[in-house]
């Protein structure tokens, strides 16, 4: 028997060695190159002469180097010179190119895993140096030049490139003058002089000239010059007056049309509404500021709702900004299939300075229905299907509001064995429904028309919901409630959400003996899961610079929640102390706490398709007054696919505490304080397949020791202290795959635990008893 095993192992080793030798023999990266092509393997050297280290010079050099850079096959981080030593993509291309025009598995492997060779002709260095030289000239380096040379390698079918960049002396602006503009336009230029892009002493830059041209055109169009265009502005540059200096004149182009030289005022506004079935307008109504043409007995939308989205009035100067605000506000209503504006002179008389406005719009379908099916796999060993049915009525009661109904349900079963040996049986379900009414404005009685007519999005949402959660072998819980929330965005990057009313009620309909045994040992857990109201209000602000389209993105969100305090103030007004406990709302206890969370995410672009993503999240929850334990749904937990991926959900914390019954102890692993940090490097592998390497750290802690009736600490090690803070941080690393389907990203992560916050019986910082015990596999959707 032993001899047989040895023979099998020997045969396997021979087979693997044979495969390796065959791959090595076949793995030529130039075997299938066309005869007249050379494989490009990167940039050998990029020499800089007369380098300009000023901010303008650094920016110029970055642009020039970007124009010259071209990553070869298997580049590291998009580098033009660093490459991975094993070119799998090229090997696959060479071995499977014969399947390029065929069908089957070979064709799929070629398309998805193969990497097309980067030829020297593809890089086209001659064209690149011309582009780079033009960039130098555009940035004011008129004497600059870029040259290249081809460096042959040991393999004559491969080559590298070397570039030489001579920045020579740059030119600067000596003077900037705005000449030959009509008096009114000249006054506008002088009034906005502080906003100019061009300044004396700046580096000469063609890009800055174009930016100034756009600025002036926008300035004129925002002040009545409807027919003005950027191309009506030209520049005169004199480089002979002073060596290395440019005397610049910004002047109108010769032959500017007469109608572009005068401002226009807004005349009559007419709105033509076409039904979603194509019904043409048959009637009209005159409303202050507009004439509304519609089909049917009534306009499809209330005239007042429409009028509040128009940011101009009759007699005002035409403004491109107000036109853009109006179009954006109408698009946000979500009730039109399309809407277009046309401006035309009020008459054909010479010198006419009035534009009539016509808006043509077609209503979208009034109902939206959606049926969504999904399969959920959770890191708590729960998996199962779910479904969501949604039905929305747009333009409800002709107010542009949306009335929505949603019905959802899901089933889950446990995929591992339970403590009593049972396995894989249906053990959980959730059913829920909700009604919501959302207005595209702030619905407040004291809100002025000016505040309601914000150029940025505003929403008011009223929502009622109910859900039933059944955790077999534990409990059945019914939750219902309602919210009123206001969203408004004062700028492109800032958003505020105010929820002045949020009332939820949780009640346990049924519990099992196993669940009762767990909570009887922990009074705090019993209170947090008990029947109670949660009367709360909250405020959230969000910063997101993604609309600015910067290279690196920053997202920051902070939330503040207050629960039960207003209710306790009402009780205090009637003689019950603010700190008095066991007060009730509708004959049930209510929660009282303060909660704050903050999360920052940064996404840094380090290559063409490479990113480094960082995340820092913290939160604190303080329960007091009526109840010193916050509801279970509000407490913090950690672990899982979107947290520390080396650990499953609620498998660590608080602090270094470890439940005696680990199988069901996750109910007890929550806290009042949370700190979590992640850093992840994302890089392309092949085609739409991306890889990731990550590092996660964090934990949850308690603000107070929790004791039983005998005064014993029931969660030792869970208290937040500076003394053991570092040791109580869980740490994990890992790698993952991301498959980008454009409309969603499928994510598979393998987490590897490096440090467990509790005593595992193993000494040292790496205290994972067995390597396999520290592995966590997570499947998820989205980043």
Sequence positions of predicted segments:
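Membrane-embedded beta-strand positions of outer-membrane beta-barrel proteins
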Residues: 371, 403-407, 462-464, 556-560, ...
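Gram-negative/organellar outer-membrane beta-barrel architecture
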Residues: 188, 299, 319-551, 555, ...
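C-terminal beta-signal and adjacent terminal beta-strands/loops
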Residues: 697-719, 743, 751-766, 783
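C-terminal motif of bacterial Sec signal peptides marking the signal peptidase cleavage site
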Residues: 23-26
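Bacterial N-terminal signal peptides that target proteins for export
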Residues: 5-15
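Flexible glycine-/small-residue-rich
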Residues: 50, 165-169, 180, 250-254, ...
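Interaction-mediating elements
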Residues: 7-8, 28-332, 341, 354
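C-terminal outer-membrane beta-barrel translocator/porin domains of Gram-negative envelope proteins
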Residues: 292, 296, 376-380, 497-683, ...
């Amino acid at each position: 028997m032993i001899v047989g095993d040895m023979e099998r192992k020997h045969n396997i080793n021979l087979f693997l060695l044979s495969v390796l030798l065959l791959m090595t023999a076949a793995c030529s990266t130039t075997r299938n190159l066309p005869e007249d092509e050379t494989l490009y393997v990167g940039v050998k050297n990029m020499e800089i002469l007369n380098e300009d280290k000023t901010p303008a010079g650094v920016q110029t050099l970055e642009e020039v180097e970007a124009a010259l850079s071209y990553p070869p096959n298997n580049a590291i981080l998009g580098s033009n010179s660093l490459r991975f030593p094993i070119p799998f993509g090229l090997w696959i291309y060479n071995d499977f190119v014969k399947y390029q025009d065929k069908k089957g598995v070979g064709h799929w492997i070629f398309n998805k895993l193969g990497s097309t060779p980067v030829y020297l002709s593809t890089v086209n260095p001659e064209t690149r140096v011309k582009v780079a030289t033009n960039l130098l000239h555009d940035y004011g380096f008129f004497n600059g030049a870029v040259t290249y040379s081809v460096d042959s390698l040991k393999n004559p079918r491969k080559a590298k490139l070397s570039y030489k960049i001579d920045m020579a002396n740059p030119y600067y602006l000596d003077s900037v003058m705005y000449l030959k503009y009509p008096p009114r336009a000249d006054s506008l230029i002088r009034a906005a002089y502080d906003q100019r892009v061009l300044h004396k002493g700046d580096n000469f830059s063609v890009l800055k000239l174009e930016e100034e041209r756009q600025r002036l055109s926008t300035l004129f169009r925002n002040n009545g010059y409807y027919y003005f265009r950027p191309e009506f502005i030209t520049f005169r540059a004199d480089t002979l007056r002073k060596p290395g200096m440019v005397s610049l004149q910004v002047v109108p182009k010769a032959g500017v049309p007469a109608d572009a030289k005068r401002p226009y005022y807004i005349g009559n506004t007419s709105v033509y509404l076409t039904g979603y079935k194509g019904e043409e307008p048959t009637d009209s109504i005159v409303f202050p500021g507009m004439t509304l043409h519609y089909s049917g007995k009534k306009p499809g939308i209330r005239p007042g709702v429409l009028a509040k989205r128009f940011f101009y009035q009759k007699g005002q100067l035409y403004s491109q900004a107000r036109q853009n605000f109006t179009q954006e506000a109408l698009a946000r209503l979500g009730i039109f299939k399309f809407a277009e504006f046309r401006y035309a002179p009020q008459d054909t008389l010479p010198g006419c300075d009035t534009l009539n406005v016509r808006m043509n719009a077609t209503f979208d379908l009034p109902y939206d229905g959606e049926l969504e099916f999904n399969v959920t796999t959770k890191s708590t060993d729960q998996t199962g299907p779910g479904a969501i049915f949604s039905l929305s009525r747009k333009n409800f009661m002709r107010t542009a509001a949306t009335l929505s109904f949603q019905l959802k349900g899901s089933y889950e079963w446990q995929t591992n064995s339970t403590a009593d040996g049972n396995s894989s049986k249906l053990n959980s379900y959730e059913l829920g429904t909700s009604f919501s009414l959302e207005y595209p404005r702030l619905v407040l009685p004291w809100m002025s028309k000016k505040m309601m007519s914000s150029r940025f999005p505003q929403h008011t949402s009223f929502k009622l919901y109910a859900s039933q959660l059944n955790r077999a072998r534990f409990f059945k819980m019914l939750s219902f409630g309602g919210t009123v929330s206001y969203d408004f965005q004062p700028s492109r990057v800032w958003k505020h959400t105010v929820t002045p009313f949020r009332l939820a009620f949780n009640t346990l309909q049924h519990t099992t003996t196993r669940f009762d045994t767990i909570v009887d040992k922990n009074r705090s857990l019993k209170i947090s899961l008990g029947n109670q109201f949660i009367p709360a209000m909250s405020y959230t602000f969000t910063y997101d610079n993604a609309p600015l389209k910067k290279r690196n993105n920053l997202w920051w969100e902070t939330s503040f929640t207050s629960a039960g305090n207003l209710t306790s103030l009402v009780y205090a007004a009637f003689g019950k102390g603010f700190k008095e406990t066991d007060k009730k709302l509708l004959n049930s206890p209510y929660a009282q706490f303060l909660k704050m969370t903050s999360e920052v995410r940064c996404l840094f672009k380090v290559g063409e398709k490479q990113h480094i993503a960082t995340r820092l999240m913290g939160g604190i929850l303080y329960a007091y007054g009526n109840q010193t334990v916050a509801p279970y749904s509000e407490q913090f937990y950690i672990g899982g696919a979107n947290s520390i991926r080396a650990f499953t959900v609620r498998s660590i914390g608080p602090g270094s505490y470890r439940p005696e019954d680990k199988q069901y102890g996750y109910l007890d692993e929550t806290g009042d304080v949370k700190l979590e940090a992640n850093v992840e490097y994302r890089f392309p592998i092949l085609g739409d397949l991306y890889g990731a390497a990550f590092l996660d750290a964090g934990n949850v802690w308690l603000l107070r020791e929790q004791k039983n009736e005998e005064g014993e600490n029931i969660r030792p090690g869970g208290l937040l202290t500076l003394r053991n803070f570092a040791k109580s941080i869980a740490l994990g690393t890992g790698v993952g795959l991301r498959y980008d389907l454009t409309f969603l990203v499928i994510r598979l992560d393998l987490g590897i635990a490096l440090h467990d916050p509790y005593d595992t019986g193993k000494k040292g910082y790496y205290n994972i008893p067995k390597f396999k015990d520290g592995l966590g596999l997570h499947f998820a959707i989205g980043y």
